[in-house]
């Protein structure tokens, strides 16, 4: 029947996709801090790079680890006598363990949990996660990236990881640096103080 006529309005929005990653390298920033370089890539729905796009980055501590590392005759073992304690949004600031900054920024000032970066013409933006050496292997964090495409279509991505310790320390040291978690010893493994 050709007398039936209907009309449907569609809204077509450009969509973007974010990928967050790291090359796995750890740099000694100074005598007290490590820096882990990261990058993000944003692609449009047609897979072309999303150039000059502002991306918001947020860093949250999701877990702290309490307990001790073990030492034996040939070296030391990664933390084994431990408990992972979840850090909720209401206590994240109390256990904030790292700072997120644009790549190359070493003057992070206050412990910053958020930053904005702009993608280059290839859709990439670099940033660093900086943290005290004493927290390596004792804290788990999550990087959240988001970018708005239009008013209703935010794109999001995340990456979570345990703050790493350089492999040279793992192989060269006969005793573990920072053997006891700064968040609590083996006897405190019930997470009641977290």
Language-model features: locations:
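Generic recognition of flexible, low-complexity loop/linker segments
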Residues: 44-45, 114-116
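Short S/T/G/P-enriched beta-strand
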Residues: 1-56, 60-99, 133-134, 138-142, ...
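Generic detector of short alpha-helix boundary/capping microenvironments
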Residues: 28, 110-111
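Short, hydrophobic beta-strand segments
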Residues: 1, 104-108, 115-121, 125-135
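Short, small/polar residue-rich loop motifs at catalytic or cofactor-binding pockets
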Residues: 35-36, 111-113
């Amino acid at each position: 029947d050709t007398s039936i006529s209907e009309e449907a309005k569609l809204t077509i929005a450009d969509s973007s996709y974010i990928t967050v990653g790291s090359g796995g390298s750890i740099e000694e920033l100074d005598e007290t801090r490590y820096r882990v370089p990261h990058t993000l890539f944003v692609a449009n729905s047609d897979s072309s790079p999303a150039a000059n796009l502002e991306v918001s980055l947020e860093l949250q501590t999701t877990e702290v680890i309490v307990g001790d590392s073990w030492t034996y005759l040939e070296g030391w073992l990664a933390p084994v006598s431990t408990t992972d304690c979840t850090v909720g949004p209401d206590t994240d600031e109390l256990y904030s363990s790292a700072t997120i900054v644009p790549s190359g920024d070493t003057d992070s000032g206050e412990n910053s949990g958020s930053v904005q970066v702009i993608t280059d013409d290839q859709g990439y933006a670099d940033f660093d996660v900086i943290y005290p050496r004493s927290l390596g292997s004792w804290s788990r964090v999550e990087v959240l990236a988001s970018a708005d495409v239009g008013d209703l279509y935010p794109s999001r991505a995340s990456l979570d990881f345990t703050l790493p310790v350089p492999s040279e320390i793992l192989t060269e040291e006969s005793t573990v640096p920072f053997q006891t978690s700064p968040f609590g010893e083996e006897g405190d493994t019930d997470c009641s103080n977290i």
